[in-house]
């Protein structure tokens, strides 16, 4: 499965309308309990049952892709492997029929989705999954693949229906002071980041350990966190909780991945393959080949670095020295330019968030959500 789709669901009288943009295998839809999620899932179920003749209209923007509810019992077979169960009490899952060019809608009440075996089962399948949940730690998804269902009453407008908006609004300011830097990567990313910042930084040894590392080591201070955004999963919500409990101000810099940043270096500029992946990653990413964009960029840099004599074949631990040149350090500085005094000759996309007292600080949060809704309504 590849490509970007604007999944639009609405009642034919336009009283209820949702539009969600998806371009990765997993998209998360969250929100307060009872607001919209179950209603949206029921809208899809009605559409499929009535074969488009009911009160619900649905479109993916492509006649090659079908959208349908996922109920688990139809698509997957539960079976015991050697009579044993997994630690979470569930059994191995096996596809009865591999999906092809499908977008599945999955409700959080479906118990089958909560085990690690379900996460394994949907990997490398020719399908996208829109999952309605408030906590899904076992799956890998990007921070901007999370959508929130809100009522416009939440932003001060009364009497208008629900809408789906991206859950996390970026911080539009600058990093102003921090006591310490934590990088989730223990090898390449951290070492190059140290050279770019000219200071020693800590590591959490991976995204999975990031929250526990911060919870254990910091309180009543401000910190700067740098992590791969491609598989950030539910860490944003957990950081908000830690920020409130530990009285932390957390600046969070999220590039797609370290490999994504390094591929912007001039040494790869002659590679048409690299240019295509950086300029139009949506058309290159295929769920049957990679779980996340991070894995895609890692494969690209390994393949392309093997063709260049001036640098070693890219490995996260070995052969790192050739990536410690001023040119690569300058490339990495491109994601640090919101820190006072740091400049770069490169331009690399990344996101900056500021979490304080458990909340994302973005200026006027309500106005930003209203602006997004206005843009959607203009379509």
PLM-predicted stretches and their roles:
Residues 40-41:
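Post-Walker A alpha-helix
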Residues 33:
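The conserved Walker
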Residues 110-111, 118, 151-379:
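Acidic, divalent-metal-binding catalytic cores of TOPRIM
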Residues 122-150:
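Sensor-1/coupling segment of RecA-like P-loop NTPase cores
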Residues 37:
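Conserved lysine of the Walker
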Residues 73-117:
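Conserved P-loop NTPase "ATPase switch" module shared by AAA+ and STAND
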Residues 29:
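Hydrophobic anchor at the beta1->P-loop junction of P-loop NTPases
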Residues 1-18, 151-154, 158-160:
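N-terminal pre-Walker A segment at the start of P-loop NTPase domains
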């Amino acid at each position: 499965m590849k490509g970007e789709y604007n999944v639009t669901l609405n009642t034919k009288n336009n009283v209820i309308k949702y539009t969600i943009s998806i371009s990765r295998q997993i998209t998360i839809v969250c929100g307060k309990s009872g607001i919209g999620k179950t209603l949206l899932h029921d809208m899809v179920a009605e559409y499929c049952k009535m074969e488009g003749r009911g009160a619900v209209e649905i479109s993916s923007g492509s006649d090659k892709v079908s959208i349908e509810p996922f109920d688990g019992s139809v698509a997957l077979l539960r079976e015991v492997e050697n009579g044993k169960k997994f630690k979470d009490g569930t059994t191995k899952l096996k596809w009865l029929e591999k999906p092809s060019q499908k977008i599945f809608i999955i409700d959080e009440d479906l118990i089958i989705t909560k085990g690690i075996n379900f996460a394994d089962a949907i990997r490398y399948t020719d399908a996208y999954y829109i999952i309605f949940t408030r906590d899904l730690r076992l799956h890998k998804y990007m921070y901007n693949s999370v959508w929130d269902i809100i009522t416009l009453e939440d932003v001060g407008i009364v009497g208008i229906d629900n809408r789906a908006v991206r859950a996390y609004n970026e911080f539009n300011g600058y990093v102003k002071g921090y006591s310490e830097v934590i990088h989730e990567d223990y090898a390449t990313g951290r070492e190059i980041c140290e050279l770019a910042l000219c200071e020693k930084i800590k590591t959490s040894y991976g995204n999975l350990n990031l929250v526990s590392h911060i919870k254990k080591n910091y309180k009543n201070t401000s910190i700067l966190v740098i992590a791969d955004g491609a598989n950030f999963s539910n860490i944003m919500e957990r950081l908000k909780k830690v920020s409130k409990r530990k009285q932390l101000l957390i600046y969070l810099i999220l590039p797609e991945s370290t490999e994504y940043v390094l591929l912007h270096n001039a040494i790869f500029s002659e590679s048409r393959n690299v240019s295509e992946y950086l300029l139009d990653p949506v058309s290159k990413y295929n769920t049957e080949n990679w779980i996340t964009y991070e894995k895609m960029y890692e494969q690209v840099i390994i393949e392309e670095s093997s063709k260049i004599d001036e640098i070693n074949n890219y490995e996260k631990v070995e052969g790192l020295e050739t990536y410690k040149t001023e040119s690569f350090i300058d490339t990495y500085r491109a994601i640090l330019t919101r820190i006072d005094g740091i400049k770069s000759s490169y331009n690399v996309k990344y996101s900056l968030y500021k979490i304080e007292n458990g909340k994302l600080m973005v200026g006027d949060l309500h106005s930003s959500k209203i602006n997004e809704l206005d843009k959607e309504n203009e379509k």
